[in-house]
Amino acid sequence: MYNKWYPQNKNELNKVLNEDMLEIPKIKNGKIKEIHGIIVPHAGYEFSGTITGKAFSLLKNKKINKSVVLGPSHYIGFYGLMILEKIETPLGKIKIIGDYEGFETLKKLEYEHSLDNQIPFLQKINPKIEVLPLVVGEVSDTDAEEIAKKLLENKDTLFIFSTDLSHFLPYEQAVKTDRQTIKIIENLDFKRIREIDACGRFPLMIMMHLCRLKDWKPKLIEYKNSGDITGDKSSVVGYGSWVF
């Protein structure tokens, strides 16, 4: 299934991806010697593509053959994890990792844009990349920790966590709300993660455990909201990207 959130013409999609990944950002709080994962939004590329692209631009010269992508479910409610059964973009089909240890028996889901929107960027990094696309339903803190431990049993993997930030708030209120969310994410604040206004709070719970177990620290790359992009500040959606 092709995605309505980005261009469906291969040449046009490549052009947009090249533009979105053109700028390699400087990390505000120091250099990252080794990149283990990123946190990125999943809105339409015209809204959040540059924020996502800056995170992926840091991976341009990295050798990445395998990635786990985790994003929230927008279309059905469930507990735990599901896996996308197939992924195809205008740039080609993606090989789904079927033998990723600890995740072999998950139920399959046909589509989820929070994952699918990341795939063209990954294909620009490595057209032959293999992906484990995990849709995250509701999870407890204990289960989030167990999922993180299982993920870490598989070596040489890039982790991608997908979330947008606040939804449909006036501009100033959104900025204030998102600043708090940014602090919670960067401080790996388990106690407050359920409070945040972000659709990917459950994937972020897993991210926090992953980072705590490995002593990784998320560092903000860029924050904007849709009001910065469209000029309409009456009701906006927040977007941020991080690297760890």
Where are these regions (language model features)?
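Active-site histidine-anchored catalytic micro-motif
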Residues: M1-T230
